């Protein structure tokens, strides 16, 4: 039995010798590479926190002591050490989540995955412990250096520093990267600490001196290394950043030296007040393919060959992010006023190609979505047209800025929302299912959802031409479907994708739901029911021709991959009522609940968004066995199908 297999909980670590702990770290890395290679997941971040996580669980008593991970994608090691070693279905339906999840374990305190929130959680939890007389309980917040670029971190530190009676330890996992190399003034400061000659050279010189003494020297070094780190950190004056906050600072500490980390954490634990432990780590540690990956050191991978790190399976199809990456560069070639903004996600959003071509016209603001949006408003005021590329789920963080800084000021800013709708394996915090409901209430906003690459190019060009209002383009994660050509385009830009002589059902599809709408129409036709399928292209505001078409049909069905409540269907229903059109409306979308990790197809199936389920329900409505929403059919129609309908069904 391996050492890892003998670890069923954190207290099993207590009996391990130093040599066994080092062996455990090696086994954990081998386990992660072998298993994440099969399922995909966040590999690089977890390889970088193995020793640090082991040390945390040896020094603190989870779950009595609360351990909170910022951007919890680096919690795989934590899962392994708390009895969850079945990674065979990691990030798959019914398997382990890719982030902390309370339903999995009492050791998962916060279901974190959005950056920069852990210190606020830690502030609140530690205050609660203090106020309820649980003074012997500690809170440990593990935060990456990338998250230090987020404003919430500093808001929390401001409050934490105001109360020095709490047992709160902040472990800064400093690997110089978030997705890619961390940027900004904070990153430069930490890099100075990480590489400062006064610390690094003295530490290495001292270590080598002990190692020259052979076995006895190495034993002596292991015994005093924690003190050595503390002495050298004070000598090299690395506390400057936190001195005015009145928070104790320990470090920098070698984050891959379990003994040194334990010593630093025990010092922090015994201090009895908020302490920052600054751990220097290496993303992708111990896995050569990750270390060779300069772009993001295997931050997140699909299925790979564990020996080489090369992707396996069929060649990747063109994806939405790639289409955006190409098209924004093409538009920028023609329009020198186009600039790009991203929040620490240059490559994941596709703006890296823009940066390569126009390095002076792209801005990475760090993990600071609110700042990104208001900065974009300022750029627009100065005569530029900013394109803010961001994941849909992270757009939620900057709603006030979109509303008050962009829309109120009629600023021409384009938001490109990647990973909109169901994203699949990353779970509830990463599904981009709220953007339609949230953003459609913003006055003056225009919102597009392209169904394919050709429509994306059209709509992006249209969006960046708008100079007096915010525009939004949203698209899902994954490969781009084949182009779906319109039968005809109406004067206001609405594409008719399919039409029938019988005007029974109008299917209004949002973006990538167009293909589903066409399959539903085909299934309805087999039952003698006529359907028209339209893609509004720009779904907010609702184009007038959608209302006109609705007036000529018996039922309108809206289909979107966002939440039903407050979504585009709600907007269509409201506009129809205001226009005096009483056509029944059936709004199809996702439930207003947090959806667990699974594939996109599995989630859509669970929500009833399949051709068979939708068609079956519509047949019941049209042929009379179920009353459609909003406008009941005449009694004679839903109690007994007309002879004409009986004939068509036959």
Swiss-Prot record:
Cofactor note: Binds 1 Mg(2+) ion per subunit. Binds 1 thiamine pyrophosphate per subunit.
Pathway connected to this protein: Metabolic intermediate biosynthesis; 1-deoxy-D-xylulose 5-phosphate biosynthesis; 1-deoxy-D-xylulose 5-phosphate from D-glyceraldehyde 3-phosphate and pyruvate: step 1/1
Binding site for Mg(2+): 145, 175
Xref: CDD domains: TPP_DXS (cd02007), TPP_PYR_DXS_TK_like (cd07033)
Taxonomic superkingdom: Bacteria
EC supergroup of this enzyme: transferase
Cellular component GO terms held in the UniProt record: cytosol
InterPro entries: Dxylulose-5-P_synthase, THDP-binding, Transketo_C/PFOR_II, Transketolase-like_Pyr-bd, Transketolase_BS, Transketolase_C
Pfam families xrefs: DXP_synthase_N, Transket_pyr, Transketolase_C
Enzyme Commission number(s) from the entry: 2.2.1.7
Annotated catalysed reactions: D-glyceraldehyde 3-phosphate + pyruvate + H(+) = 1-deoxy-D-xylulose 5-phosphate + CO2
Keyword Magnesium: yes
Gene Ontology terms, MF aspect: 1-deoxy-D-xylulose-5-phosphate synthase activity; magnesium ion binding; thiamine pyrophosphate binding
This protein's UniProt keywords: Isoprene biosynthesis, Magnesium, Metal-binding, Thiamine biosynthesis, Thiamine pyrophosphate, Transferase
Cofactor(s) the protein requires to work: Mg(2+); thiamine diphosphate
KW Glycoprotein (keyword) present: no
Annotated thiamine diphosphate binding sites: 73, 113-115, 146-147, 175, 287, 369
Gene Ontology biological-process entries: 1-deoxy-D-xylulose 5-phosphate biosynthetic process; isopentenyl diphosphate biosynthetic process, methylerythritol 4-phosphate pathway; terpenoid biosynthetic process; thiamine biosynthetic process
Assembly information from the UniProt record: Homodimer.
Function summary: Catalyzes the acyloin condensation reaction between C atoms 2 and 3 of pyruvate and glyceraldehyde 3-phosphate to yield 1-deoxy-D-xylulose-5-phosphate (DXP).
Membership in a protein family: Belongs to the transketolase family. DXPS subfamily.
Protein name, UniProt field: 1-deoxy-D-xylulose-5-phosphate synthase
Species annotation: Leifsonia xyli subsp. xyli (strain CTCB07)
Gene: dxs
């Amino acid at each position: 039995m391996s050492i890892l297999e003998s670890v069923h909980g954190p207290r099993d670590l207590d009996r391990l010798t130093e040599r066994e702990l080092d062996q455990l770290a090696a086994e954990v890395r081998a386990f992660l590479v072998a298993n994440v290679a099969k399922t995909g997941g966040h590999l690089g971040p977890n390889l970088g926190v193995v020793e640090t996580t082991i040390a945390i669980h040896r020094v603190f008593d989870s779950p009595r002591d609360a351990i909170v991970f910022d951007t919890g994608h680096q919690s795989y090691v934590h899962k392994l050490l708390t009895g969850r070693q079945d990674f065979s279905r990691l990030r798959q339906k019914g398997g382990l989540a890719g982030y902390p999840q309370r339903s999995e374990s009492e050791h998962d305190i916060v279901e974190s995955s959005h950056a920069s929130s852990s210190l606020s959680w830690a502030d609140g939890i530690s205050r609660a412990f203090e106020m309820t007389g649980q003074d012997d309980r500690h809170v440990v917040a593990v935060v990456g250096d990338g998250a230090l670029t987020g404003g919430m971190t500093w808001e929390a530190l401001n409050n934490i520093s105001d109360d020095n009676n709490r047992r709160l330890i902040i472990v800064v996992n400093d690997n110089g990267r978030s997705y890619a190399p961390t940027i900004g003034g904070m990153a430069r400061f930490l890099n100075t600490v990480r590489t400062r000659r006064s610390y690094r050279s003295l530490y290495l010189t001292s270590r080598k001196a002990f190692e020259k003494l052979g076995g006895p020297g190495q034993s002596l070094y292991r015994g005093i290394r924690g003190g050595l780190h503390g002495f050298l950190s004070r000598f090299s004056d690395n506390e400057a950043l936190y001195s005015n906050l009145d928070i104790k600072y320990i470090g920098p500490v070698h984050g891959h030296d379990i003994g040194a980390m334990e010593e630093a954490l025990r010092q922090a634990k015994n201090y009895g007040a908020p302490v920052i432990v600054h751990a220097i780590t290496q993303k992708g540690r111990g896995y050569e393919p990750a270390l060779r990956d300069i772009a993001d050191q295997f931050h997140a991978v699909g299925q790979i060959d564990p020996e080489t790190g090369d992707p396996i399976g069929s060649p990747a199809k063109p994806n939405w992010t790639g289409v955006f990456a190409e098209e924004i560069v093409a538009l920028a070639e023609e329009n020198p006023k186009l600039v790009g903004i991203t929040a620490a996600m240059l490559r994941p959003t596709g703006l890296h190609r823009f940066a390569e071509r126009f390095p002076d016209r792209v801005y990475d603001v760090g993990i600071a979505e609110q700042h990104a949006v208001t900065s974009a408003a300022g750029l627009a005021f100065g005569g530029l047209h900013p394109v803010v590329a961001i994941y849909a789920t992270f757009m939620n963080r900057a709603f006030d800025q979109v509303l008050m800084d962009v829309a109120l000021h009629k600023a021409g800013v384009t938001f490109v929302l990647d990973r909109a709708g169901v994203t699949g394996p990353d779970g509830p915090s990463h599904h981009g299912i709220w953007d339609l409901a949230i953003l459609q209430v913003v006055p003056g906003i225009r919102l597009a959802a392209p169904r394919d690459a050709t429509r994306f190019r059209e709509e992006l060009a249209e969006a960046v031409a708008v100079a007096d209002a915010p525009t939004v383009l949203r698209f899902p994660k994954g490969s781009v479907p084949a182009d779906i050509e319109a039968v005809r385009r109406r004067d206001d830009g609405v594409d008719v994708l399919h039409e029938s002589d019988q005007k029974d059902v109008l299917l209004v599809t949002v973006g990538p739901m167009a293909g589903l709408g066409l399959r539903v129409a085909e299934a309805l036709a087999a039952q003698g029911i006529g359907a028209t399928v339209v893609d509004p292209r720009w779904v907010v505001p609702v184009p007038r021709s959608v209302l006109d078409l609705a007036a000529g049909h018996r039922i309108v069905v809206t289909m979107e991959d966002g939440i039903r409540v407050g979504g585009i269907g709600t907007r269509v229903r409201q506009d129809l009522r205001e226009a005096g059109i009483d056509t029944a409306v059936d709004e199809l979308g996702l439930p207003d609940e947090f959806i667990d990790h699974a594939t996109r197809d599995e989630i859509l199936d669970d929500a009833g968004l399949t051709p068979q389920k939708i068609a079956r329900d519509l047949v019941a409505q049209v042929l009379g066995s179920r009353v459609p929403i909003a406008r009941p059919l005449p009694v004679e129609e839903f109690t007994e199908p007309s002879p004409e309908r009986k004939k068509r069904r036959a």
